[in-house]
Structures are given as structure tokens and as C-alpha cells.
Regions:
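Glycine-rich phosphate/dinucleotide-binding loop and adjoining beta-alpha-beta core of small-molecule
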Residues: 1-5, 44-148
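Positively charged, low-complexity intrinsically disordered leader regions
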Residues: 1-49
Length: 148
């Protein structure tokens, strides 16, 4: 039998894990790594082996960035489109860029044509914007990118 957690239960589990020595950073590495391994196992035969993550400002965005880094290590091409994330001093973004990932800023260089091309030529799309902290009504930019 599968067990699903509510948002409140998930936050409680994470808080308790952190209090018992499993840091939020380690949880993020674990989540991103396991997502990448699953993607690689399920979609390894895709041609091209490319992944695009929509990366928001929360922990879900961090999970997505870790997954992209792991996919690069596994031979994938990876792109990230950041949405409402301050990335200039973000260590996960810097790691992703050092590994050869392509970064697009929804509010900067990610034109409609670039995004359309990315969406059409990527094998896997990772949602790194809507996590447990997501609230309805979505910000106009977020709703627009999800329309793709």
C-alpha cells in the first residue's frame, strides 16, 4: 500500500529529519540524485538525452538543479530556466554552470523563441517551481510559462 503525505506532514518529516542530523542540503542532494537516476533509467534511450528544468526560488528548484547536475554527470545535456530565483550568488546555479549546463532567465535572456525551441527539443521536463509551498493563484509569469 502506498502512503502519501500531506504538505503539513511532509514539512514535519523534513523538520524532524533535520533536527536529527539529516540536513536540508543533504535531503536536497538525495532528492535530486534519486530523481536523476530515475530519469536516466526511464528515459536513457531518448534521443537526444536532454533535460530542461523550470527552476523556482524554493527547495523544489534546488532539487531540480541537483538533478540536472547529476544528469550532466550521466552524459545528458541539461538546461535550466530560472523563474523568480536570484542566481548570481547561488551555489547550485554556479555548480550547474561549471558542469556545462545552459542557463536561461525567464525575466532576462529567455525569449519566447528560445523557450519554444527548448520545449520542442528536450526529452524530459522537470518541474522545479511548484513544490509544497506553492499557492494558488499563480503569479502571471508562472502561469504563462506553464502554458507552454
Amino acid at each position: 500500500m502506498e502512503k502519501y503525505l500531506s504538505v503539513a506532514e511532509m514539512r514535519s518529516v523534513e523538520r524532524e529529519a533535520n533536527e536529527n542530523g539529516l540536513s536540508y542540503a543533504t535531503m536536497m542532494e538525495n532528492a535530486g540524485t534519486n530523481l536523476a537516476l530515475w530519469i536516466n533509467g526511464e528515459y536513457n534511450l531518448c534521443n537526444p538525452r536532454s533535460a530542461l528544468a523550470l527552476v523556482g526560488s524554493g527547495n523544489n528548484g534546488g532539487d531540480a538543479l541537483v538533478a540536472l547536475c547529476r544528469l550532466i554527470e550521466l552524459g545528458w545535456h541539461a538546461s535550466a530556466c530560472v523563474i523568480n530565483r536570484q542566481y548570481e550568488n547561488d551555489p547550485l546555479i554556479q555548480r550547474f554552470l561549471r558542469m556545462g549546463g545552459s542557463l536561461f532567465d525567464w525575466e532576462g535572456n529567455a525569449t519566447e523563441a528560445i523557450l519554444s525551441n527548448l520545449f520542442q527539443h528536450t526529452s524530459v521536463l522537470i518541474d522545479g517551481i511548484l513544490g509544497t509551498g506553492a499557492r494558488l493563484h499563480l503569479h502571471q509569469d508562472m502561469a504563462r510559462i506553464l502554458d507552454y
